[in-house]
Amino acid sequence: MGKVYDRFEERLEIQAIADDITSKYVPPHVNIFYCLGGITLTCFLVQVATGFAMTFYYRPTVTEAFASVQYLMTEVNFGWLIRSIHRWSASMMVLMMILHVFRVYLTGGFKKPRELTWVTGVILAVLTVSFGVTGYSLPWDQIGYWAVKIVTGVPEAIPVIGSPLVELLRGSVSVGQSTLTRFYSLHTFILPLLTAVFMPMHFLMIRKQGISGPL
């Protein structure tokens, strides 16, 4: 094993990378509230794992969605646990994200030179809320259906472009299969892809600039 490691070390300088990760300076004023972003990331990773597991059983059609969720909850081994963890971690992720935003704002972490870190963080916050809105509808029960109807109906109050926006969100004039398909695509593909782009940017900027000092 030693010879194998030495070959990789010679070419990739693994030890230097490890030293850089483990020896980063942490300011003395840092406390538990500075862990909220990391907790949000942990919740997101739990979401990815449990969400991926549920895609094996979920059927994104208006006739089968609810039944597939019921099957997952009652027939699949530990299916109830997987879905419950997904729901609990989703709620925890939103809560931790909100607290993280407040902590950064109250401690001035958005100020120069960390403006871009703040911008990517706000984008990630919007993506987090979007995950919640789209995921809430996927069981296609009464709560999910009416939540979608209300959320997608909000833009209708906008002059001129309101109605086209509603049709764009729903896929048609009314809520139906097109709406569920769009929300499922957003929840399982588009939003995760955008998160996979902005999250590394966010963490790399934090890594480069370090944690902001006390007020």
UniProtKB/Swiss-Prot annotation:
InterPro entries: Cyt_b/b6_N, Cyt_B6_PetB, Cytb/b6-like_sf, Cytochrome_b_N_euk/bac, Di-haem_cyt_TM
Residues annotated to bind heme b 1: H100, H202
One of the GO BP terms on file: respiratory electron transport chain
Main location: plastid
Cofactor or coenzyme needed: heme b; heme c
Location(s), subcellular: Plastid, Chloroplast thylakoid membrane
Membrane topology value: Multi-pass membrane protein
Any one Gene Ontology molecular-function term assigned to this protein's record: electron transporter, transferring electrons within cytochrome b6/f complex of photosystem II activity
GO CC annotations, alphabetized: chloroplast thylakoid membrane
Stored Pfam families: Cytochrome_B
Keywords assigned: Chloroplast, Electron transport, Heme, Iron, Membrane, Metal-binding, Photosynthesis, Plastid, Thylakoid, Transmembrane, Transmembrane helix, Transport
Record-listed heme c binding positions: C35
Family membership noted in the UniProt record: Belongs to the cytochrome b family. PetB subfamily.
Stated role: Component of the cytochrome b6-f complex, which mediates electron transfer between photosystem II (PSII) and photosystem I (PSI), cyclic electron flow around PSI, and state transitions.
UniProt cross-references to NCBIfam families, sorted A to Z: PRK03735.1 (NF002990)
Other facts: Heme 1 (or BH or b566) is high-potential and absorbs at about 566 nm, and heme 2 (or BL or b562) is low-potential and absorbs at about 562 nm.
Assembly information from the UniProt record: The 4 large subunits of the cytochrome b6-f complex are cytochrome b6, subunit IV (17 kDa polypeptide, PetD), cytochrome f and the Rieske protein, while the 4 small subunits are PetG, PetL, PetM and PetN. The complex functions as a dimer.
Protein name: Cytochrome b6
